[in-house]
Amino acid sequence: MERQPTTDRMIQEYVPGKQVTLAHLIANPGKDLFKKLGLQDAVSAIGILTITPSEASIIACDIATKSGAVEIGFLDRFTGAVVLTGDVSAVEYALKQVTRTLGEMMQFTTCSITRT
């Protein structure tokens, strides 16, 4: 009797840690990007955050809006996605405040803020 090859089976499970996995500033985005995202194009910057656990995105929006003149463009409390809008310096400062507060006060692992 010939031996059949076996297939290894792997089960993967998503276990989120406390982390900010993306913090990005888009300075002076094109009007098409605003249109595709459903945002008003009267601002000069978009900030993007991805956070786990996703409920912390609510805290991030609270920190960001209290830090200065930014508005919440999008918040998904189920995926942890946050989009902020405002002028470049306000959005940059908001991203810094969010990553600093989550990192220092709540012991999240944070990433560097990137910019395009």
Curated annotation (Swiss-Prot):
Q: What induces it?
A: BMC production is induced by growth on 1,2-PD vitamin B12 medium.
In Pfam terms, one family for this protein is BMC
Keyword field: Bacterial microcompartment, Transport
Biotechnological applications: Artificial BMCs can be made in E.coli by expressing pduA-pduB/B'-pduT-pduU-pduN-pduJ-pduK (in this order). Enzymes can be targeted to the BMC, and appear to be encapsulated within it.
What compartments host this protein? Answer: Bacterial microcompartment
Task: Please tell me whether the keyword Transport is annotated for this protein.
Answer: yes
- Cross-referenced CDD domains, in alphabetical order? BMC_PduU-EutS (cd07046)
Q: Which Gene3D superfamilies match?
A: 3.30.70.1710
**SMART domains, A to Z:** BMC
Q: Which PROSITE patterns match?
A: BMC_CP
**Pathway(s) served:** Polyol metabolism; 1,2-propanediol degradation
* GO CC terms of this entry: propanediol degradation polyhedral organelle
Q: Answer whether the UniProt record assigns the keyword Magnesium to this protein.
A: no
Note from the entry? Bacterial microcompartments (BMC) 100-200 nm in cross section are formed during aerobic growth on minimal 1,2-PD-B12 or anaerobic growth on 1,2-PD-tetrathionate medium, but not during aerobic growth on glucose, anerobic growth on glucose or pyruvate-tetrathionate. BMCs can constitute up to 10% of total cell protein.
Q: What does its UniProt record remark on the domains?
A: One side of the hexamer is concave which is lined by hydrophobic residues, the other side has a slightly protruding, 6-stranded beta-barrel which is occluded in PDB:3CGI by side chains.
As for family, the record states: Belongs to the EutS/PduU family.
Note the subunit structure. Answer: Homohexamer with a central pore lined by a beta-barrel. Hexamers pack into a loose array. Interacts with PduV, probably via the beta-barrel which is predicted by modeling to be on the exterior of the BMC.
The protein here is known as Bacterial microcompartment shell protein PduU
Q: Which organism is it from?
A: Salmonella typhimurium (strain LT2 / SGSC1412 / ATCC 700720)
